[in-house]
A protein has these predicted regions:
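Active-site catalytic motif of lipid deacylating hydrolases and related acyltransferases
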Residues: 20, 29-112
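Structural recognition of the beta-strand scaffold that forms the well-ordered cores
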Residues: 26-30, 68-71, 114-115, 145-148, ...
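Short, well-ordered, mixed-charge alpha-helical segments that flank or form enzyme active sites
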Residues: 76-79, 123, 153-157
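Short, well-ordered amphipathic alpha-helices
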Residues: 54, 125-133
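Basic, amphipathic N-terminal segments that precede the first structured/catalytic domain
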Residues: 1-15
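Surface cap/lid and interfacial helix-loop subdomains adjacent to catalytic sites
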Residues: 95-109, 130-215
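Gly/Ala-rich beta-loop-alpha elbow adjacent to hydrolase catalytic centers
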Residues: 117-121, 125
Length: 215
């Protein structure tokens, strides 16, 4: 897939993604809220919305890894704007959890894996890391990194570990593995009632700029 890349100095250029024959790692991608289906939870029919967002967000990673992008019964745009029950929220997570277990059992084969999620995908993967990866040394060993964008990952103020995850730290170096990149972007200062980027007195929302990480 062709992509426009913004270069230093304000110029831009086209890059064509090339897929390696034998990528050394995997990527497990969970797409954001895109379903416009009626109802609170989407069904598992692949609509154009899922295809387009997966191509736009995940295809670039195919230059480095095998991409696994499971369908799941996400909360739809209607569901997000309403008041979904805990059971409806759990239904979205249940599908991703089942896909993760299937991936580990049949496809991982002890390979390193990058977790990638945006918006609702990041929230779902936050829970997956918290309940699965963070608790299991074998799974933490496979984690290359977790890119959880717009997911309100919490850490204690001034700390890089703790909060949402007890063992998986924030990434602070480009060469670091087993860590998490998280941030939410705003074009202005977020209001006090913003859904993203607002911490508490003791916890802050993780903000790692991957472009600033140095090896």
């Amino acid at each position: 897939m062709t992509a426009t890349v913004e270069l230093a100095g304000g110029t831009s250029g086209l890059q064509h993604a090339s897929r390696p024959r034998k990528p050394k790692i995997d990527c497990f991608y969970v797409y954001p809220t895109v379903s416009g289906q009626p109802g609170v939870n989407a069904n598992l029919h692949i609509d154009p919305e899922e295809t387009v967002v997966a191509q736009n967000q995940a295809s670039r990673f195919s230059q480095t890894c095998r991409v696994f992008a499971p369908m799941y019964r996400q909360l739809t745009t209607t569901g997000i704007l309403g008041k979904p029950t805990k059971a409806q929220q759990a239904l979205a997570y249940k599908g991703v959890l089942a896909a993760w277990h299937d991936y580990l059992k049949h496809s991982n084969k002890h390979r390193g894996v990058v977790l990638i999620g945006h918006s609702q995908g990041a929230f779902v993967l936050d829970r997956l890391v918290k309940t699965e990866v963070d608790r299991r040394p074998a799974e933490r060993k496979r984690l290359v990194s977790a890119l959880l964008i717009g997911g309100n990952i919490q850490v204690p103020v001034g700390k890089t570990v703790g909060g949402d995850f007890k063992h998986v730290p924030a990434c602070t170096r480009g060469s670091q593995i087993g860590c998490v990149v998280g941030y939410s972007t705003f074009d202005t200062t977020p209001p006090a009632n913003a859904l993203f980027g607002i911490g508490t007195a003791t916890r802050q929302i993780l903000c790692v700029n991957p472009a600033s990480l140095r090896i």
